[in-house]
UniProtKB/Swiss-Prot annotation:
Species per Swiss-Prot/TrEMBL record: Prochlorococcus marinus subsp. pastoris (strain CCMP1986 / NIES-2087 / MED4)
Reactions performed catalytically: 7-aminomethyl-7-carbaguanine + 2 NADP(+) = 7-cyano-7-deazaguanine + 2 NADPH + 3 H(+)
A GO CC annotation given for this chain: cytoplasm
One matching Pfam family: QueF
Name of this chain's protein: NADPH-dependent 7-cyano-7-deazaguanine reductase
Top-rank taxon, per record: Bacteria
Associated pathway: tRNA modification; tRNA-queuosine biosynthesis
Broad class of the protein's primary localization: cytoplasm
Amino acid sequence: MGTANLHDSTNKPLYGERIIEESNIICFENPNKKRIYEISIELPEFTCKCPFSGYPDFAKLNIYYQPNMKVYELKSLKLYINKFRDLKISHEEVVNRIMDDLLKAAVPHWIHLNADFNPRGNVSMKLDIYSGQKRN
């Protein structure tokens, strides 16, 4: 078994970085298409960078959705979300991009994406985006 060389100064991506970079949202078939049900997913460690200062922004993302034909696979979703860690992007743009990718991957009946950004400089921000018609 090999050991990590902590003094390796090459710019070669580490295995975790490669996996994150190559990741996409994967879905699997909804196991019960006849039933209307709601799934909630919490991603409490979302990060991206402020496009103006370069400082990190931290948020908790909550996804609530009613699946149609497909359901999100959680590990792929986690890896996909990690892609934004070093990206300089506004709160509004990143949340809309995530919503677009969620809609493209699974086409749920209804989805709500909530982003609760941590306060920075005495200012906090919450974003909510909805798509589709919630069913009862």
